[in-house]
């Protein structure tokens, strides 16, 4: 009988932990929001593009680049993880003409998970 109780306790502990496991497996840095917002239309060049993630990023392995409407890389755009908020990726943006632009990002969270994606915005005059 004394051997059965510890087994039951272990079984109960496992059953209680099961609902938590999917959340642990899904602990990647996801894009929480951006400025400018995805699919937005702007009247002029934004001073910078900001991408906020759900987890802190590894600065050495996280970055982004800007593409124009022809999917060519825009010179002068440079991305870096913010020195104060490690979940924020900031991109300086050169003067841009009217058109559609795509921010392509690839970030590594501090727990080493890779997340990649893109978002677009449009500039009108």
PLM regions and their residue ranges:
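Bacterial N-terminal signal peptides that target proteins for export
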Residues: 2-11
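Bacterial N-terminal signal peptides
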Residues: 12-20
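N-terminal signal peptide c-region/cleavage motif recognized by signal peptidases
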Residues: 22-24
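N-terminal edge beta-strand
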Residues: 26-45
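Extended, polar beta-sheet/loop recognition surfaces of beta-rich domains
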Residues: 48-52, 110-125
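Short, surface-exposed alpha-helix to beta-strand junction/turn motifs within ectodomains of secreted
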Residues: 50, 55-77
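Short strand-edge motifs at loop-to-beta-strand transitions and within beta-strands
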Residues: 87-91
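A glycine-anchored, Pro-Gly-centered beta-turn/N-cap motif
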Residues: 92, 97-106
């Amino acid at each position: 009988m004394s051997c059965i109780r510890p087994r039951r306790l272990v079984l109960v502990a496992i059953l209680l932990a099961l609902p938590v496991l999917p959340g642990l497996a899904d602990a990647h840095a996801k894009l929480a929001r951006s400025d400018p917002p995805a699919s937005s239309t702007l009247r002029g060049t934004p001073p910078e593009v900001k991408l906020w993630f759900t987890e802190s990023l590894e600065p050495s392995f996280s970055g982004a680049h800007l593409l124009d409407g022809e999917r060519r890389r825009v010179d002068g755009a440079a991305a870096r993880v913010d020195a104060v908020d490690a979940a924020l990726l900031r991109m300086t943006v050169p003067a841009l003409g009217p058109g559609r632009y795509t921010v392509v990002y690839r970030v590594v969270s501090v727990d080493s998970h890779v997340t990649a994606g893109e978002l677009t915005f449009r500039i009108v005059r």
